[in-house]
Amino acid sequence: ASPIQQEYPIPQNSVNHDIVAIWDIYPTILNMLKLKVPVGHQVDGEDISPYFRGDSSFHRTQKIFQHFPHHHSYANFYSTCREGDWKVIYNYMDQYAHTDLYSGNGYRTAGRFPWQLFNLKDDIGESNDLAQDPAQQERLMRMARSLIRELRQADAQYPVLTRNGQAVGTAYIRMPDFPDVDSDGDGVPDLVEDANGNGVIDPGETDPDDASSFVPIRQ
């Protein structure tokens, strides 16, 4: 066995179903080499070396976010949240006109439902979109808020809307338009608590994920 196999002897025939990300490699290798992250260097990934020791008590954070607020070779303008077996995708180009986001030659898809939801345990190829399945609407609302709040907390950049080459606004994520979903079961629909549908708790709004945050007014 190589030195690394001796140092990290994964038990034979073991299987772990936790999710990890490619950006976990950097902090993991640093730990293996007993090196520290350079001062002032922000690291998105997590050290997953305990998996290689067969530490069954270790679990990486089982929520992973990706954010591509720009045009590139194989996809355009999207953000994702992976939580366990579930993955939600927000497609900015389905919410906004393509020409509003990118000045190059492209196609217009604005008007389509911008959210996608997949169960990767059953559908690793992401071919069965469950975003508009009534049975999954609450899940989508919760994951959408989780994605939006993570991006806001990270002070993420968003696509810029343009007209004739001039910036005219920002393409923020919009919550799914599911007026009947009540995620916290407090009798008040999510889009009443989050009246502007931006996924964050603004002044005068209450938390759709916390039933205790809504206090009815007594007559």
Per-segment meaning from a language model:
Residues 128-136, 196:
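Active-site-proximal N-terminal segment of extracellular/periplasmic enzymes that hydrolyze or transfer
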Residues 144-163, 167:
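Bilobed periplasmic-binding protein-like "clamshell/Venus-flytrap" ligand-binding domains
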Residues 3, 28-36, 51-55, 133, ...:
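Structured segments of extracytoplasmic/periplasmic soluble domains
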Residues 123:
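Intrinsically disordered, low-complexity polar regions and short flexible loop motifs
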Residues 160-161, 166, 174-219:
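Extracellular calcium-associated, cysteine-rich motifs in secreted modular proteins
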Residues 7-14, 18, 23-26, 30-116, ...:
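C-terminal cap/loop subdomain of S1 sulfatases and analogous C-terminal strand-loop tails that border
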